[in-house]
Amino acid sequence: MPVLQILAHTPLWVWALFAFLVYRGVAAMGGREVSPYRVLIVPAVFFVWGASSLLERSDGSALNVAAFLGALLVGAAAGGVLASLTPAPRLSPATGLLAMPGSPVALVLNCVAFAAKYAGNVALALTSGAAAHAELASVVVAIGGLFAGLFWGRTLRQFQRALQADGRTATVAALAALVVGRRTSREA
């Protein structure tokens, strides 16, 4: 199938998602203050996209579920390491916002993740034969898990570093309080 036909048959929501991811990546290049829950948007998008691939392609396959979960864990670990290599965000006590340092990392990750998912789904659409389709479906599901984990691991590590820079322990309660915009009773 020619490339132009593939592009023409791509649903509009896919291009809207790509535009959104590029927009968010470009916005992340400049330092900015954002509410913690807004930082969760892109990881949530990739988790939903990855989980939908799992649901669409699993056919009850334990292999696909294992591929998704295994890749999710590997991605989360890699995302945590990646977040450790960049400057830590700072928490503004007055506003409760996160001061995110500018970086091209989000734009690059968004584009690479989109390209990998897009290419995998195009390859699936073009694959004939049940065995080849099942094998490729496992790869596409794993890619979805890998990038969902990468974004979640990076985000959670950024939250942890912001709390630590603010002199707080990064407990589950402190992370939840950060996202909803209030301090836990032990921190007040």
Q: For each predicted feature, which ranges?
A:
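C-terminal membrane-adjacent module
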Residues: 108-188
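Cytoplasmic-side transmembrane-helix entry/capping segments in multi-pass membrane proteins
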Residues: 33-46, 64-71, 95-99
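Structural signature of hydrophobic alpha-helical transmembrane segments
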Residues: 4-18, 65-74
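Alpha-helical transmembrane segments
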Residues: 61-77, 139-146
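Short juxtamembrane and helix-loop transition motifs at transmembrane-helix boundaries
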Residues: 1-6, 24-34, 71-72
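C-terminal ends of transmembrane helices
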Residues: 19-34, 80-93, 154-161
